[in-house]
């Protein structure tokens, strides 16, 4: 399959197909998506060497991962985001590079990528509330898109993000509707912007019902299974334990489930658990009936859209910044139920 044949199959000109694959802004999103899907279905890939010579581009996109958040490499969200982005890169004839970086070396890595011309653009992962990478990359003149947002960064930049505040407000409201008032929040690292926004949503839902937040029921760490287990074990031993847990990660929610079981309690009966992000390529939340009630975000789609956004910026560096907010679905599973009339305390 070559460009001429692909264009004929789609009933489009070769110029339109080429511009769609290269992310040119004058091609509509519907046409661009149609062309990319056809390219994937037929196995068509542009010749990167020829395109690189013709355009002066590296035909590669960079993903720089800070070692301080290296747990992201084991996070199924990161894996599915990369999988979605890779579909767009493949259709457009781009390669992808992954670089691990220490915090002190991160700026040098970006400068090196820029100086060597190894990549044409960057996807920024795991933005912090205040993130110096955004003004740095802007000053460097490197096209980039942020997966997430940085609340304290005022300058305009391109990003794609979940409505984390809305998702966690809805999740907490669902638990409040079930009669829960002692709702624990097991969040991500407090410096991460997504965790900040999720806590805002949680607090907003409590405030709307006149429920005062208890600092003893709010915790933020790296979202691992042991973290979920330890936090839930400690909270269940409180004099007035939580009757529900709102958890920022399915992996941590699995740890919460283990703590509930070890305490001799039943998830969904004695204690409710509501997780965020529950359906991944290699980690599934049950089959016909989800085990966990969860807010489900379109992670793979976010990867595709972020890659398309970046390719448009590479094709036309003068474009104004683009932003996109995606919504989460509330999926009802077996892990939630009405609040018990009297919470069961677990001996410490």
Predicted regions and their residues:
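Flexible loop/turn connectors
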Residues: 233, 237-348
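Alpha-helical recognition/docking segments in bacterial nutrient-uptake
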Residues: 60-64, 68-173, 177, 235-237, ...
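Hinge/beta->alpha junction and helix N-cap segments in small-molecule ligand-binding domains
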Residues: 67-80, 98-107, 160-170, 186-233, ...
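N-terminal helix-turn-helix DNA-binding module of bacterial transcription factors
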Residues: 1-59, 347-348
């Amino acid at each position: 399959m070559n460009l001429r044949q692909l264009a004929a199959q789609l009933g489009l000109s070769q110029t339109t197909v080429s511009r769609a694959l290269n992310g040119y802004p004058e091609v509509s999103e519907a046409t661009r998506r149609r062309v990319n899907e056809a390219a994937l279905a037929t196995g068509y890939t542009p010749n990167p060497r020829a395109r690189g010579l013709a355009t002066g581009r590296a035909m590669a996109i960079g993903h720089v991962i800070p070692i301080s958040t290296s747990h992201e490499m084991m996070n199924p969200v990161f894996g599915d985001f990369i999988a979605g982005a890779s579909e767009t890169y493949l259709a457009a004839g781009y390669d992808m590079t992954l670089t691990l970086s220490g915090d002190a070396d991160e700026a040098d890595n970006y400068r090196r990528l820029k100086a060597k011309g190894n990549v044409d653009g960057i996807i920024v992962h795991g933005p912090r509330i205040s993130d110096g990478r955004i003004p740095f990359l802007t000053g460097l003149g490197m096209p980039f898109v942020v997966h997430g947002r940085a609340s304290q960064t005022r300058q305009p930049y391109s990003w794609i993000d979940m409505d984390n505040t809305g998702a966690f407000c809805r999740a907490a409201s669902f638990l409040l509707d079930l009669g829960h008032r002692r709702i624990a929040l097991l969040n991500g690292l407090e410096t991460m912007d997504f965790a900040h926004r999720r806590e805002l949503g949680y607090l907003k839902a409590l405030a709307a019902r006149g429920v005062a937040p208890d600092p003893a029921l709010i915790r933020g760490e790296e979202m691992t299974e042991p973290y979920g287990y330890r936090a839930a074990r400690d909270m269940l031993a409180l004099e007035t334990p939580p009757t529900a847990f709102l958890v920022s990660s399915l992996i941590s929610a699995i740890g919460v489930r283990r703590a509930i079981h070890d305490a001799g309690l039943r998830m969904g009966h004695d204690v409710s658990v509501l997780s965020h992000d529950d359906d991944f390529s290699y980690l599934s939340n049950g089959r016909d009936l989800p085990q966990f009630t969860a807010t489900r975000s379109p992670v793979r789609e976010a990867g595709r859209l972020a890659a398309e956004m970046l390719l448009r910026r590479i094709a036309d560096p003068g474009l104004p910044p683009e932003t996109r907010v995606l919504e989460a679905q509330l999926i009802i599973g077996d892990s939630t139920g009405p609040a018990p009339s009297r919470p069961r305390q677990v001996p410490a």
